[in-house]
Amino acid sequence: MSLSNKMIFLVVDDSKISRKWLIEMIPKKIVENAEIIEGSNGEEAIALYDQHKPDVVFLDITMPVIDGFEALERIRAINPEALVVMISADRQKSTKEKVLSLGASAIISKPVDEQEFRTTLLKLVF
């Protein structure tokens, strides 16, 4: 992926503040040439993924309607190569193992460290 192509990011979290904060952490040189789509639950994540086919998805685990685990599975059913970064306040090893076994590209713990977030994003898109 190159910065000359318009990238699409899907940011899904039931907290509007968390979504805003995640969006603000995307490096400016990337965000200037990107479309950012927001969702507030797993059901929206699946529909928005199917409609927009984003380059990278940031997906919270604990959300209403459909949780992040199920949303991840359904997104991976649409596109097995989807780049999905799971975001979770749950720091248990079993949670990390579960999301990676479901096909997540990475998992980042809340509170999200800005440097970890940016490093993870840059590894995925370059």
Per-range role (PLM):
Residues 112-122:
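C-terminal output helix
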Residues 63:
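Receiver (REC) domain active-site loop signature in two-component systems and cognate sites
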Residues 38-47, 68:
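Helix N-cap/capping motif at the beta->alpha junctions
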Residues 91-106, 119:
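Alpha4 helix (beta4-alpha4-beta5 surface) of REC/receiver domains from two-component response regulators
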Residues 16-37:
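Two-component/phosphorelay signaling modules centered on CheY-like receiver
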Residues 52-58:
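Active-site beta3 strand of CheY-like receiver
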Residues 47, 69-80:
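Short amphipathic alpha-helix used as the core "switch/output" element in two-component signaling
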